[in-house]
């Protein structure tokens, strides 16, 4: 890809739109699956939990989340109208039954009351938050006492080598994330560092180091 194409690819990752956005969302279902599973493991979901996800994309992973326990309820937030529509279409039966609920938001203030959710998950979205510290405070606000949040993200040392992250991305490392969560009043439960094989757009397999940080509200 030339520079212009790389920049556009990065913008699509931040805010998928149009046919290209739908294609990228399908790709992310595959490339994000390991991180999504690891973050879900860190949540320790139990029966009856109410879940919130920030940046769900087309939400092709919803069945995996809902299979973790019984009587779960899922809420998804997206800044991308196309992803909101695609996730709603793809999971129409669960929307109709009230198990899944999808919403658009502007990317900063979460449109929910205090202490609404038992578990919060977000995968590869933190780079696009306008103010990561403020968002961590928002996540803490909507989390129930005893609730758990899990954030999964590529480590800065790896992400900075990817040419499409030069624009639209604010790269982070796990120590920064730990600090933001602690300043939001949360207690760190786990900081997990992992490496997985992922396929690039050219088909090459590369090692991707990533982190999962989980925290609870006492």
Predicted region positions:
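Class I SAM-dependent methyltransferase SAM/SAH-binding core
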Residues: 50-109
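A short glycine-rich, Lys/Arg-flanked "PGG" loop and its adjoining helix->strand segment in the class I
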Residues: 133-145
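Core SAM-dependent methyltransferase catalytic element
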Residues: 197-218
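A short acidic, Gly/Pro-enriched loop at the edge of an enzyme's catalytic core
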Residues: 108-119
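Conserved class I S-adenosyl-L-methionine
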Residues: 148-178
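A short SAM/SAH-binding and catalytic strip from SAM-dependent methyltransferases
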Residues: 119-132
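Conserved alpha-helix/loop element of class I SAM-dependent methyltransferases that forms part
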Residues: 30-49
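N-terminal, positively charged/glycine-rich alpha-helical extensions of SAM-dependent methyltransferases
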Residues: 1-20, 30
């Amino acid at each position: 890809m030339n520079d212009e194409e790389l920049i556009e690819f990065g913008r699509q990752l931040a805010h998928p739109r149009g046919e290209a956005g739908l294609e990228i969302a399908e790709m992310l279902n595959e490339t994000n699956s390991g991180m999504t599973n690891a973050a879900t493991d860190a949540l320790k979901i139990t029966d009856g939990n109410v879940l919130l996800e920030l940046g769900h994309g087309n939400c092709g992973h919803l069945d995996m989340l809902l299979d973790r326990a019984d009587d779960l309820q899922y809420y998804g937030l997206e800044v991308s109208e196309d992803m909101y529509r695609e996730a709603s279409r793809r999971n129409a039966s669960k929307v109709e039954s009230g198990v899944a609920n999808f919403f658009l938001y502007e990317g900063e203030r979460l449109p929910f009351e205090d202490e609404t959710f038992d578990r919060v998950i977000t995968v590869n979205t933190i780079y696009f938050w306008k103010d990561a510290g403020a968002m961590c405070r928002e996540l803490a606000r909507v989390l129930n006492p005893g609730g758990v949040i899990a954030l999964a993200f590529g480590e800065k040392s790896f992400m900075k080598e990817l040419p499409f992250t030069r624009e639209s991305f604010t790269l982070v490392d796990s120590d920064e994330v730990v600090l933001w969560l602690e300043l939001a009043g949360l207690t760190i439960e786990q900081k997990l560092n992992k490496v997985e094989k992922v396929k690039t757009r050219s088909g090459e397999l590369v090692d991707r180091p990533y982190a999962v940080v989980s925290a609870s509200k006492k």
